[in-house]
């Protein structure tokens, strides 16, 4: 978020971040040491911030909305969406932006009704080498689909890489011998990588 604001040339007087992962916090503070960390979103109050807020943006946990997740919707980790709504109501920012995965239409409608704006679906493949469809709810005016920059996976891959980053022969064989994994990890769609996925583990 702060990178985007920097690129847009938007000066920020105070930047608050709600994060609980200690490694994410370390990275943020290394790159943006003036960031004010306020802890878990469920404990954030207007009094803690004590400033006029112009913009709030975030992405509530997607695991319970994602097709690759547990499918529990607002009853799982994705219920933290309601904390985003609560903070919006308490701080009354001029603008907001929420990002999340493409999900079931009934869940999408709940978020749309709560925020009062229709989502915009943007595929990151327009500006990167990865297919990644995401929904964005925002009251920021004049948000539009970015132009396709035509970035392919071949454009961003390094050709000379230290062997320590190579898959082992055993690992390569495991992927290529498994039909499902081979399709998932080696297929290119128009020169684009499939959506990258990661496992969420809360740090201690």
Where are these regions (language model features)?
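Short, glycine/polar-rich helix-capping loops at beta-to-alpha or helix-loop-helix junctions
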Residues: 24
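Conserved SAM/SAH-binding beta-strand->alpha-helix loop
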Residues: 21
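Class I S-adenosyl-L-methionine
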Residues: 44-55, 60-204
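Conserved SAM-binding strand-loop segment of SAM-dependent methyltransferases
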Residues: 34-40
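Short, structured coil segments at secondary-structure junctions
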Residues: 11, 31-33, 115
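Short beta-strand element of Class I
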Residues: 14-16
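Conserved SAM-binding loop of SAM-dependent methyltransferases across substrates and taxa
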Residues: 1-10
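Conserved SAM-binding loop
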Residues: 28
């Amino acid at each position: 978020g702060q990178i985007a604001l920097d690129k847009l040339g938007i000066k920020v007087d105070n930047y608050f971040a709600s994060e609980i992962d200690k490694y994410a916090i370390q990275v943020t503070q290394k790159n943006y040491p003036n960031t004010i960390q306020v802890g878990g979103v469920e404990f954030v109050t207007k009094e803690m911030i004590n400033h006029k807020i112009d913009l709030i943006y975030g992405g509530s946990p997607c695991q319970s909305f994602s097709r690759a997740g547990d499918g529990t919707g607002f009853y799982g980790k994705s219920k933290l969406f309601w904390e985003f709504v609560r903070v919006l109501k308490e701080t009354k920012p001029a603008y907001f932006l929420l990002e999340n995965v493409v999900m079931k239409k009934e869940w999408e409608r709940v978020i749309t009704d709560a925020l009062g704006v229709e989502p915009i679906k943007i595929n990151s493949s327009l500006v990167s080498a990865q297919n990644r469809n995401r929904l964005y709810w925002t009251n920021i005016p004049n948000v539009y689909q970015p132009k396709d920059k035509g970035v392919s996976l071949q454009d961003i891959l390094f050709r000379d890489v230290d062997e320590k980053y190579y898959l082992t022969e055993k690992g390569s064989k495991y992927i290529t011998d498994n039909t499902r994994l081979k399709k998932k990890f080696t297929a290119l769609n128009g020169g684009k990588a499939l959506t990258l996925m990661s496992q969420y583990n809360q740090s201690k």
